Amino acid sequence: SVTYCPLTGTAMGFERGDTTFGVSGRLVNNNLIMYDRGTEAWWPQVLATSIPGPWNEDPGTESLSEFRLVWTTWGKWTDKHPDTRVLSFDTGFAKSYTRDPYGTYNPRDGYYDADASPMFPALNEDDRLEPKRVVIGTRTAEGAAAFDMSALRSAKLLEGDLAGSPVVAAYDPELDTGYVFRNPEDRRFDYRDGAVVDGTGGTYAPSALPTERLYAFDAMWFAWSGFY
């Protein structure tokens, strides 16, 4: 399932197995709560973890398998993937999906302006960044880490810490996105001409550093800091 929540700026993909997902109409930390039609459990999108819903008993804590979605422009995507097929323009609804009712992302205005307030009160207020500044975040069983996308665009590489273990984020200018990797040996990387270079002279695409790539996704800062 491909899911999107405009209120938190999160586009996330989930392996659904034999079930299908619906939208409950409820929110937590402004983030959509999905439900699966198999167990009727509720699933906050950002957490990807089940919570009891009103139609079922406590299912216990389960987590969804996720796959990476890339938030980018259609132009950048088709430049890199010219054979991409659009599955359908027929959504089955009369509502037009050619216009975003909340504002625009390029340039960012309306609801998406970095300084704008969330639609509903956030779970946590963290003033290290503007509420709707876009970060790329990753979370594992050990902890969570997030990188400011504006800073990553400028620096190309950023180092961070995830529960005491080094991680590194790399910027991909072709898709205007970032990737996060474990860096257990705290290796030194440099960025040259759109590629990442390690200490031995090895050259890598920003999406393919020679270490474990972690699942990551874009989110508004207030949403990320509210959950993590």
List PLM regions with ranges.
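Mid-to-C-terminal functional-domain signal that highlights helix-capping/loop sites
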Residues: 1-228
